[in-house]
UniProtKB/Swiss-Prot annotation:
Complex formation: Part of the 30S ribosomal subunit. Contacts proteins S9 and S11.
GO CC annotation terms, alphabetical: small ribosomal subunit
Family: Belongs to the universal ribosomal protein uS7 family.
Organism: Campylobacter fetus subsp. fetus (strain 82-40)
Protein name per Swiss-Prot or TrEMBL: Small ribosomal subunit protein uS7
Protein role: One of the primary rRNA binding proteins, it binds directly to 16S rRNA where it nucleates assembly of the head domain of the 30S subunit. Is located at the subunit interface close to the decoding center, probably blocks exit of the E-site tRNA.
PANTHER family: RIBOSOMAL PROTEIN S7
SUPFAM superfamilies named among the record's database cross-references: Ribosomal protein S7
Domain of life: Bacteria
UniProt-listed NCBIfam families: rpsG_bact
Length: 156
């Protein structure tokens, strides 16, 4: 184990929207250090949303999608006397954001549209409208926490 807690590295806001969450999203989207490809996919998806949405702005849809997918509660395994319990715990804000980004990207990759740009745009629109696979994942996570509320006293 490390002696001290690792310092949180500050990310630069993205050049177009000046938003740090978009930078984090691009970094999570990136494969093999190809940031320019990830950036192209992200901005392309936001432009696609701008074109589709009419009065909807891509950045607003993005922010709504992240907010809708952020989990409030999750379960963590805790071993007590030979039995493993799923203990519900609150999710810290930084982890909420990280999980929301991770879920949106992973479920966008599993979609059936042709390009990643289209997949991401569709998943962001679905998440902003409180539907889609990433939103369902959040709901399932919350249901698991609710179902295991009886073990909440095992929290540490």
């Amino acid at each position: 184990m490390r002696r001290r807690k690792a310092p949180v590295r500050e990310v630069m806001p993205d050049p177009i929207y000046g938003n740090k969450i978009i930078t984090k999203f691009i970094n999570s989207l990136m494969y093999d250090g190809k940031k320019s490809v990830a950036t192209e996919i992200m901005y392309g998806a936001l432009k696609t949303i701008d074109a589709k949405g009419g009065d909807l702005k891509g950045i607003n849809v993005f922010n709504d999608a992240i907010d809708n997918v952020k989990p409030i509660m999750e379960v963590k395994s805790r071993r007590v006397g030979g039995a493993t319990y799923q203990v519900p715990v609150e999710v810290r804000p930084a982890r909420q954001q990280a999980l929301a980004i991770r879920w949106i990207i992973s479920f966008a990759r599993k979609r059936s549209e042709r390009t990643m740009m289209e997949k991401l745009a569709a998943e962001l629109l679905d998440a902003a409208n409180s539907k889609g696979a990433s939103f369902k994942k959040k709901e399932d996570t919350y249901k698991m926490a609710e179902a295991n509320k009886a073990f909440a006293h095992y929290r540490w």
